[in-house]
């Protein structure tokens, strides 16, 4: 039963309406937004990215792995006048899903961790997965950074003159990880870029985290 007072809005699809409201709310704020996706590693990469960005800017991020059309607007609603940046994780299992998410998010930078076999039953092949993941570029402005894993065979083939594509990796990439040393609970490595080296220690183990 409806309460006798208050406003109610009837919509055809509550999930689509929630995403549309989130997109409208996000459009009120002129802030940089990092959007990231990938077959695996999305949530860990989101956490690392938000820590780096958050070291300088007041940053909001996707909570847990709430990365679909219901969870994503909940993150967008966290933005307020003090927010300086956002890191948004995007998941999908069908074509068109990331397209709808970026329409609401309006990212200014995008990152793809890898192309594996997750949801291949819905997308037909790894090429289909690549196509679906690249929907993340639909919301990017021309010239925006597009950061890709150069060690992934599918992502390494991506070319698009509309964006500033940057590859990272251990074997291939403009940004490369070298001198990797795994310890009991940490991993040391060097990030090398155009002859410059930055030593990094992360509080976890595993080359996949590097």
Language-model features: locations:
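N-terminal leader/targeting and accessory segments in enzymes
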Residues: 1-20, 24
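Phosphate-binding loop of NTP-binding sites
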Residues: 16-145, 150, 154-163, 193-196
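Active-site regions of enzymes building and remodeling cell-envelope glycoconjugates
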Residues: 5-12, 161-169
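Short beta->alpha connector loops at strand-helix junctions that form conserved
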Residues: 1, 11-13, 63, 169, ...
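Adenine nucleotide phosphate-binding catalytic loops in nucleotide-utilizing enzymes
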Residues: 126-127, 163-210
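Residues that form or immediately flank small-molecule/cofactor binding pockets and catalytic motifs
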Residues: 13, 64, 151, 170-173, ...
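Short secondary-structure transition/capping segments
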Residues: 3-9, 73-75, 122-123, 178-179
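Short, polar loop motifs at secondary-structure junctions
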Residues: 1-3, 150-154, 170
């Amino acid at each position: 039963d409806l309460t006798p007072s208050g406003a109610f809005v009837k919509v055809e699809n509550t999930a689509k309406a929630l995403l549309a409201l989130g997109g409208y709310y996000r459009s009120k704020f002129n802030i940089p937004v990092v959007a990231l996706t990938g077959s695996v590693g999305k949530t860990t990469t989101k956490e690392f990215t938000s820590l780096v960005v958050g070291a300088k800017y007041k940053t909001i991020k996707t909570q847990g792995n709430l990365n679909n059309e219901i969870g994503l607007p909940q993150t967008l609603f966290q933005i307020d006048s003090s927010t300086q940046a956002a890191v948004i994780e995007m998941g999908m299992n069908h074509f068109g899903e990331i397209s709808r998410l970026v329409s609401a998010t309006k990212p200014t930078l995008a990152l793809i961790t890898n192309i594996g076999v997750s949801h291949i039953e819905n997308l037909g092949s790894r090429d289909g997965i690549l196509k679906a993941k690249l929907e993340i570029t639909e919301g990017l402005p021309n010239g925006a950074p597009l950061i890709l894993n150069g060690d992934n065979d599918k992502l390494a083939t991506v070319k698009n003159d509309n964006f500033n594509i940057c590859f990272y990796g251990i074997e291939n990439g403009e940004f490369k990880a070298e001198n990797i040393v795994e310890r009991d609970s940490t991993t040391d490595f060097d990030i090398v870029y155009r002859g410059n080296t930055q030593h990094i220690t992360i509080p976890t183990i595993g080359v996949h985290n590097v």
